[in-house]
Amino acid sequence: MQENRPVIALDFPEFSDVKDFLEKFDPSEKLYIKLGMELFYTAGPQVVYYVKSLGHSVFLDLKLHDIPNTVESSMRVLARLGVDMVNVHAAGGVEMMVAAKRGLEAGTPIGRQRPKLIAVTQLTSTSEEIMQNDQKIMTSLEESVINYAQKTAQAGLDGVVCSAHEVEKIKAATSKEFICLTPGIRPEGASKGDQKRVMTPKEARTIGSDYIVVGRPITQAKDPVSAYHAIKEEWNQ
């Protein structure tokens, strides 16, 4: 099922930046917010509690990648924060991903729904050249992504983070219900920034993405609210 709200990546360095940004929106409008490493390492759980207190959904983007026991324990803690989605690196392996889900289930308070758990396949900043030269994965980028997606499904996770260009083949290799969350989304004419594999909101919708993540085209816009609504409208066409 496709989420009708673009996920806004609040890649800010300070808690105060989050407050300033969210205050621009009408309090009645409920957003889907991605909180990343820098912000969480700076502000800690309080930034999650604050965003949730305003009624917004939270994707806590920490990309856990460690030994299974450590990831399981960490997920047990993150589940208590009330977030709606968390992620791990698929490169950690099936055992680690299974442990992550187990920890998430154990930590979710009674009466609450377990946060969705997705895995990163290859970062959208990774090119095939980088993958082959630096990671020494001597297949195509697409084959690597699909392999990671299949391992993620095997582990029982809800979906993956992937480029919109890979959505159709990932769903064919897993299932239609398997979530594909796609960063690297840019409105027509926007700068690609450090993203190597990008797509517009309309293209991502057409190709079957379930969630899209948009950061700088919204957060660095002169009018972030208008920019968000324009992207949301394009996403829901």
UniProtKB/Swiss-Prot annotation:
Pathway: Pyrimidine metabolism; UMP biosynthesis via de novo pathway; UMP from orotate: step 2/2. Pfam families: OMPdecase (PF00215). SUPFAM superfamilies: Ribulose-phoshate binding barrel. The active site is at residue 63. One of its GO terms (molecular function) is orotidine-5'-phosphate decarboxylase activity. SMART domains: OMPdecase. It comes from the Bacteria. GO terms for biological process: 'de novo' pyrimidine nucleobase biosynthetic process; 'de novo' UMP biosynthetic process. Keywords: Decarboxylase, Lyase, Pyrimidine biosynthesis. InterPro entries: Aldolase_TIM, OMPdecase, OMPdecase_AS, OMPdecase_bac, OMPdeCOase_dom, RibuloseP-bd_barrel. The keyword Lyase applies. Its EC number is 4.1.1.23. One of its GO terms (cellular component) is cytosol. CDD domains: OMP_decarboxylase_like (cd04725). The keyword Lyase applies. Substrate binds at residues 11, 34, 61-70, 124, 186, 195, 215-216. It catalyses: orotidine 5'-phosphate + H(+) = UMP + CO2. HAMAP family: OMPdecase_type1_B (MF_01200_B). Catalyzes the decarboxylation of orotidine 5'-monophosphate (OMP) to uridine 5'-monophosphate (UMP). Belongs to the OMP decarboxylase family. Type 1 subfamily. Homodimer. This is Orotidine 5'-phosphate decarboxylase. It comes from Lactococcus lactis subsp. cremoris (strain MG1363).
